Amino acid sequence: VNTHAHRDHVGGNRYFERALIGEAELPVYLDGRKKNGFCEADIIREGDIIDLGGKTVEAISFPGHTPGGICLLDRADRIMFTGDSVLGRTVWLFMPNSVPVSEMKKSLEHLNTWRSEFDWLLTGHSRKIDDPRYIDELIGACDAILTGGPAERFGQVEIWGDKLDCCYYTGEDGMQSTLVFRVLCPPVFWLASPSLT
């Protein structure tokens, strides 16, 4: 089960006969499949229950880091697997196909509707998050960015041949994460921070 189609998450697919991936991830996955010999993939949609052999998880749609990202809810052990959708240090929204901050906020609010069903989040690259209220901190960061809060220029990042201008926002004291997001024109949030103009 792939949370999204980035190479660092689908590389092991060559060892399986079939994989599952979100529908909006399929074009990226198929391109990688041609180059890397990945297995065939079936579409997974929100609400699908996946039997992993003695363990079941439910797919939850999460456009953010990628447009077709999914999280997986393990109700029995009260774990939300987030892949790269929610990380413990930095959430990357600057990738070539990442969604805008406004869409990320909607996805976080959507994920929050399951909050009573998990006690911690298991991420794709960082430590586990043992307080689901962390999602509220990320929603607050999205709100601050969308209302012109103080963002700092991150600089230009080159990823997979694309050069992207990025900014980051780190919240108030106690905020555990940083949102790194693409600069979209017009960069209205720069108005709050003259150092970014």
Language-model features and meaning:
Residues 3-5, 9, 30-35, 49-52, ...:
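Short C-terminal domain-edge/linker segments immediately following a structured domain
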Residues 19-20, 43, 96-99, 191:
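Generic low-polarity alpha-helical segments
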Residues 109-197:
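Accessory terminal helices/loops
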Residues 4-9, 65, 125, 183:
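Histidine-centered active-site/metal-ligand motif
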Residues 27-29, 34-39, 62, 81-88, ...:
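Residue-level signal for well-ordered alpha-helical segments
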Residues 1-51, 144:
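Active-site HxH/HxHxD metal-binding segment of metal-dependent hydrolases
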Residues 58-63, 67-146:
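Metallo-beta-lactamase
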